[in-house]
Amino acid sequence: MQLIEKAMLPTPWGNFLIFGFEEKKNGKNHVALVYGDIKTNTPTLSRVHSECLTGDAFFSLRCDCGSQLEMSMKRISQEGSGVLIYHRQEGRNIGLLNKIKAYALQDRGLDTVQANQKLGFSADERDFSLCADIFNILNIKKIRLLTNNPFKVQMLSDAGINIVERVPLIVKKNPKNAYYLKTKAEKMGHLLSE
């Protein structure tokens, strides 16, 4: 992983710096949004947010991704400093077209885990070690991680990131994502209550 460039990114929650990274092995791009001074000895409030075009850009109500992205940026801004890594592994790393296929299977009654498995994938194909590389490049040694996903905590810890606290990121359910969130809690171990 290498840092390519950084620039100012004004948002409704204040000015972030956007850092552009490139994987050396395949040229895939990732970004980190940094708010305030992260060069302190206190653990950095951090979010590793996996790419979700449908939720983040198209406001899909099928998932909680867009709401989590917005809430994370607000929380980091309110905190006064922090980092959000936008992890470019769409659809829990099955890719956009396979995610749309999984949606079609969900429309026919499968849950999100069953749909992934029907397509030949595990419930979660993501590799969080890339995010550890980004934290290291940004010289972030200790984090408070905004997540409901114990798998993410474990994978980042295994990659050498010192997570001193898991900070819940609870967003409101809606009728379109209630079954999805129930599946994430029951089958993937997500902690969806404080």
UniProtKB/Swiss-Prot annotation:
Cofactor(s) the protein needs: Zn(2+)
One Pfam family it belongs to: GTP_cyclohydro2
GO biological process per UniProt: riboflavin biosynthetic process
Record EC number: 3.5.4.25
GO MF term set: GTP binding; GTP cyclohydrolase II activity; zinc ion binding
Statement: the UniProt record of this protein carries the keyword Zinc: yes
Record: residues binding GTP: 47-51, 68, 90-92, 112, 147, 152
Keywords assigned: GTP-binding, Hydrolase, Metal-binding, Nucleotide-binding, Riboflavin biosynthesis, Zinc
Annotated Zn(2+) binding sites: 52, 63, 65
InterPro entries (UniProt xref): GTP_cyclohydro_II, RibA, RibA-like_sf
Regions crossing the membrane: none
Pathway(s): Cofactor biosynthesis; riboflavin biosynthesis; 5-amino-6-(D-ribitylamino)uracil from GTP: step 1/4
Cofactor note: Binds 1 zinc ion per subunit.
Catalytic activity: GTP + 4 H2O = 2,5-diamino-6-hydroxy-4-(5-phosphoribosylamino)-pyrimidine + formate + 2 phosphate + 3 H(+)
Enzyme class name: hydrolase
Catalytic residues, chain numbering: 124 (proton acceptor), 126 (nucleophile)
Cellular component terms per the entry's GO annotation: cytosol
Family annotation (PANTHER family): 3,4-DIHYDROXY-2-BUTANONE 4-PHOSPHATE SYNTHASE, GTP CYCLOHYDROLASE II-RELATED
Alphabetized NCBIfam families for the sequence: PRK00393.1, ribA
Similarity comment text for this entry: Belongs to the GTP cyclohydrolase II family.
Quaternary organization: Homodimer.
Role noted for this protein: Catalyzes the conversion of GTP to 2,5-diamino-6-ribosylamino-4(3H)-pyrimidinone 5'-phosphate (DARP), formate and pyrophosphate.
Protein's name in the database: GTP cyclohydrolase-2
Organism: Buchnera aphidicola subsp. Acyrthosiphon pisum (strain APS) (Acyrthosiphon pisum symbiotic bacterium)
Phylogenetic placement of the source organism: Bacteria, Pseudomonadati, Pseudomonadota, Gammaproteobacteria, Enterobacterales
